[in-house]
Amino acid sequence: MTEENGKIRNISYFQAIFEAHQEEMLRDERVVLIGEDISLYTKAGILDAGLERRIFSAPISENGFCGMGVGAALTGLRPVVDLTIASFVYLAMDQIVNQAAKIRYMTGGQATIPIVFRASMWHEGSNAAHHSDRPYPMLMNAPGLKIVVPATPADVKGLIKSAIRDDVPVVVFEDNSLWFQSGPVPEGEHLTPLGVAATRRPGDDVTLVAIGGAQKVALEAATALASEGCSVEVIDPRSLVPLDRPAILGSVERTGRLVIADPANRTCSAASEIAAIAAEEAFHCLKAPIMRITTPDIPIPFSPSLEDPLYPSTEKIVDVIQKLQ
């Protein structure tokens, strides 16, 4: 993390996203934005009007404009492609997984793809099955991509800026439930390194790894459990690829217990991968089974009364950790 002037402000997650875009576009003329309806960014005053010539509104063809971004990256630009909703990743899998992720390997490093794909993960608000997925586990299985899931305003700004400067394709999964939550963000230059986890709360009894939007309920659960004498260490991986294994394993070796809260579906999830790593490399330290708190393997329903109970919650985390004691 770096900062120019030492000033800290409270701004929203949403503001931090576009502050990162603006700063990087002003810093580097190779940075361009591609996506649906994004010309509205300057018209609405979200970005400076002077940046309009580097903002390209595309037709509703995710595979098409992601391909445009890959081509732009090959010519030396640094495109940021806004997929709007994370579920639309499926429509662009060929460009993201088959092209962006592989070209550097297939050319022996002669070609680089400095591209960022932004995908907003929607839940709550009855967005239904076609708009509510969290497909980051699928992309974790695509060698050549970096995957980040920022949970705070400071990290969404710092990770987007670092992603734009990276020569490897990066997919940024933003949780829209965090958009209007505010937090401290350094003013000026601020970078969050990819592949470095953050310990949000120290603890001695249980390691709780919480991904993206699950951070909020994880910290609430840790506070509730502290009143019962249970000390929970909360870790935010921030990056899923590369994953900060030493931070997670070091915590598990101290606490002997691991719980993972992941808002994505259960099977073949980031939670599953973290659990497997701990079982392989820290089994000798474990005092209890590794537990996962995830969304079940079903399409997300439209009805709020059916949707809301699916995600990791404070109550679910507290219940699981109490049973480990």
How should each PLM-predicted stretch be described?
Residues 1-173, 176-325:
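Thiamine diphosphate
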